[in-house]
Amino acid sequence: MLPTQSDRLLSYGDPQGEADLRQVLADYIRQRRNVNCSADDIVIGAGVQSILNLLCPLIHDRKTVSFPNASFVQGSTIFSDYGFEVQYRNKDCDVIYVSPAHMTKWGEIMPVSRRMELVHYAAAKGSLIIEDDFENEFVYFQRPTPSLFNLAGGHGVVYIGSFSRLLLPSIRLSFMVLPPSLSRKYAAVAERYSQTASKAEQIALCQFIRDGHLTSQTKKLKKLYAQKLKALENEVRNTFGSNCTIQTGAAGTSLALTIPYARTGLELKKEARMHGMSLLILEENAATITILLSCSSITTDDFAPACQLLSRLLNK
């Protein structure tokens, strides 16, 4: 007799992740991202950090890792803890960590030509690419570009996906697809590790995807965020006029606002916090400041009041 879903909750989970969820994910990313793999190549964990904690011992023979910038501290810290030398924007490193659909905080996407160049260069050097496909679901203004995993034919690339944007940040479920050489390495040591992701959440997500709800959710959120991002851009232009520069990409939920400002970003952040506003400052110099504005966790009705408050703080 096959176990019921309730019965499954009475046992420990598969260290690699629930088999049915791994199969559903293999089918899903094959259809959505043309990532061709088997369920045996997929490893599930509670967030990207957990995934990287499993990956680093498999690639301990490599010594250097490159990140696009210093903003992904959660990722670079894991590699540093395992003895990797962390560098930035250096394609000659042994490991290259990249998010092609999130090259900048405001959603610039790596073009296909650059992806092909990176895949070929890494293959020639023997480097491993880690493709974090963060926010690939939210590409609005151009056709989705192929994954690096697909362009590399499934070799020399580790593909990482997660669901924090599509579902809830509190649902800590991420996965990685290992190329054949690393998949064999992981299989030899899998039983040494415990599964970090909730078994109940894995079972629920599996059914959610099977029933078509994830595809439906993605379509709804993609439409919603595209509309909200455009509305935010319009509100920023209305508030700051020609005095500002706005940078937007083809994906994501944020834009970058550059505006004249003579004081320090630290002062601005402190004053903003006093008014209940949290600011992410991307860059500042003696004459201007660049701030990241996100539409994801604020209602459209609050765009105008938020922009007006920011304008007052900048002009104090």
What are the roles of these predicted feature ranges?
Residues 3-126, 130, 136-138, 143-155, ...:
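Conserved core of the PLP fold type I
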Residues 182-201:
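Active-site C-terminal subdomain of aminotransferase-like
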Residues 150-185:
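Active-site PLP attachment segment
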Residues 1-14, 274-277, 282, 293:
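N-terminal "arm"/small-domain region of PLP-dependent enzymes with the aminotransferase-like
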Residues 223-233, 244-258:
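Conserved glycine-rich beta-strand-loop-beta hairpin in the small C-terminal domain of fold type I
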Residues 178, 256-261, 278-308, 312-313:
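Conserved PLP-binding active-site segment of the aspartate aminotransferase-like
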Residues 186-190, 211-233:
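Structural signature of PLP-dependent enzymes
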